[in-house]
A protein has these predicted regions:
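The conserved acidic donor/metal-binding loop of glycosyltransferases
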Residues: 180-184, 208
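Conserved nucleotide-sugar donor-binding catalytic segment
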Residues: 226-328
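Acidic donor-binding segment of Leloir-type glycosyltransferases
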Residues: 109-152
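Glycine-rich, basic loop-to-helix element that forms the pyrophosphate-binding segment
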Residues: 153-171
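Cell-envelope/extracellular polymer assembly enzymes that use nucleotide-activated donors
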Residues: 90-93, 121, 286
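Short aromatic/hydrophobic "clamp" motif used to bind/position activated sugar donors
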Residues: 176
Length: 329
């Protein structure tokens, strides 16, 4: 589909001037397959905004030789990462996909509702559980009616990623946290993880994970990622292309989605959802790589996400990875 230059320009100017990711703008951009970058330029002159952004899309035929020069561009743009209001508390949509995790729900939900960061909406999704999960979820929905929605499927969806997509379609927040129903976290988890989004280039921020089994710590994120050249001993913000080359292309450095918060970019690309339908494993890895493209990724070691390993874990590939790594050492 052809997009008029002026229409695209209007979207980009709105995107930048408001200094936030508007779902409507990003949806429009996604539809035209050009969400391959993150805005990190502060406009000094909107007259030549297309000089930078259309060059990114390789449509330099629209510009004169003078307009394409680096000197000309530098006089109209500052290359900086736009920062949001330090006091801003963006709404976080917390999506809790559940299937037969009744024994873990209380600890999970308490760790959400007791967060020190309180600007949240909670979307509880039950995928036709056969245990008493729905009763537990209803108790919390009644206890926190002001910021909770409960959706119970009448039949099982067959794939956890379909539940993710349903939650994303319902989310109103600027940020998304998919908090799996069998995990839990520190009460200041959101406070620390959300801080990174003051930087407009950050597309995903994740926390340190501790792997739990039968109530005991069995591994840490550092142990899981010990064979990568990137250090997870301290917090960082890193360009996506750098961390993909050094780590993300080798191993999924976000082993559990509960440890991550990401920007709400609206509808997920058909390219991703089509692959999701074919995948029983690694769909989260694919999603992260699509999401962070062109931006930066943040990691904090100041708070913990507790990833529970058990027979009904959403993904057992981590358990296989742990077993293999233990044997191979």
């Amino acid at each position: 589909m052809f997009v008029k230059k002026d229409d695209l320009l209007s979207m980009l100017i709105s995107f930048i001037y408001e200094k936030k990711v508007y779902v409507t703008s990003v949806n429009s951009i996604t539809k035209y397959k050009i969400l391959g970058f993150t805005v990190v330029k502060h406009i000094k002159s909107d007259t030549y905004v297309r000089n930078v952004f259309f060059k990114i899309f390789r449509t330099t035929r629209y510009f004169t030789e003078q307009e394409q020069s680096l000197d000309f561009s530098s006089r109209h743009f500052d290359v900086v990462d736009l920062s949001m209001d330090q006091d801003k508390k963006p709404l976080v949509s917390v999506i809790v996909p559940n299937y037969n995790h009744a024994p873990y729900l209380k600890e999970r939900l308490d760790s959400i509702y007791q967060q020190t960061y309180q600007n949240i909406e909670v979307i509880l999704l039950d995928d036709f559980s056969s245990d008493n999960s729905v009763e537990v979820l209803k108790q919390y929905a009644r206890k926190y009616p002001h910021n909770t929605r409960l959706i119970v499927n009448e039949e099982n969806s067959g794939k956890v990623f379909r539940q993710w997509n349903k939650g994303l379609s319902l989310a109103k927040g600027e940020l998304i946290w998919i908090a799996e129903s069998d995990d839990y976290c520190d009460v200041n988890f959101l406070d620390e993880v959300v801080k990174a989004f003051v930087h407009q280039s950050v597309m995903l921020s994740f926390a340190h994970s501790v792997f739990m089994q039968d109530g005991k710590k069995i591994w840490t994120l550092e142990q899981y990622l010990h064979d990568l050249p990137v250090s997870f001993e301290s917090s960082f913000i890193m360009p996506a292309h750098t961390i993909v080359n050094e780590a993300f292309a080798i191993k999924n450095i976000v082993p559990n989605v509960s440890s991550a918060v990401f920007r709400n970019v609206g509808a997920i690309s058909d390219e991703v959802t089509t692959l999701w339908e074919k995948m029983s494993l690694c769909g989260d890895w694919l999603f992260y790589l699509w999401l962070i493209k062109g931006g930066t990724i943040s990691y904090t070691n100041k708070v913990n996400n507790y990833y529970r390993i058990h027979s009904k874990s959403t993904s057992l590939r981590i358990q296989r990875t742990l077993d293999y790594s233990t044997v191979s050492r």
